[in-house]
Amino acid sequence: MKKICSTLLVLCLLLTASSLAFADQSQKKAVYELYSVDGFYEDEVGNAEAYSFHVPQIFDDTPDAEAINSEIAERFGNRVEEQFLNMEGGYSLWSWHAEWKAFWNGTQLFLLITADENGGFKDYGAYGYDFETGSRITNEMILEQKGISEEEYLENLREKVQFMFEDMYSSLSEEIREAAGYDEMLEKTLGWLDMEQPMFIDQLGGIETIVKIASVAGAEWYYYLATPFSYG
């Protein structure tokens, strides 16, 4: 009897390991790269730096996967193409890096794409896709899955972003705050928050959101990642 139980246990472990290995291989094949280029470039005025461009695509034959891939190619692929054209002409690059991360939640894939620009600006893109249903994952679906209402989500998001804003500019003197329009900037930042901000489920099962925070210098605003719900 003990021998039978031991044999069954071994079989279960082997099946589990095989299943996990299959799932891991399936996940690896689920995403491919439209661009995968690394190198070093020096322009005609002597600006030199390493560049790295990696832009993902979803490997699935559905209308939603095709739509997401087109959006990614238009937003991030075109950016890379512009840098290639600049290299051909010996001109300066305005973007040097584009990278992506994949977060899995069962059959759900969430892609986070980050691309930098000169001046410290970062562009973010978040996309969700369910391989089981072959459909795009919307913000509303994420909240429903987590059992969170839109009101609760927006309240937490505003609290988180306000904390980020205040922490970001905590070192500014009252004089500089007044000159920069600190209160107006905070009001503007919170006013940008709605259900349209891209969100995704991260590796810990928390919800992360791409938000805009008003800036006292440089661009009017910059993108940041906010985590209104960090639990799984």
Task: Give the positions of each predicted feature.
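Sec-dependent N-terminal signal peptides of Gram-positive bacterial secreted proteins and lipoproteins
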Residues: 4-23
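Compositionally biased intrinsically disordered regions enriched in Thr/Gly
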Residues: 21-232
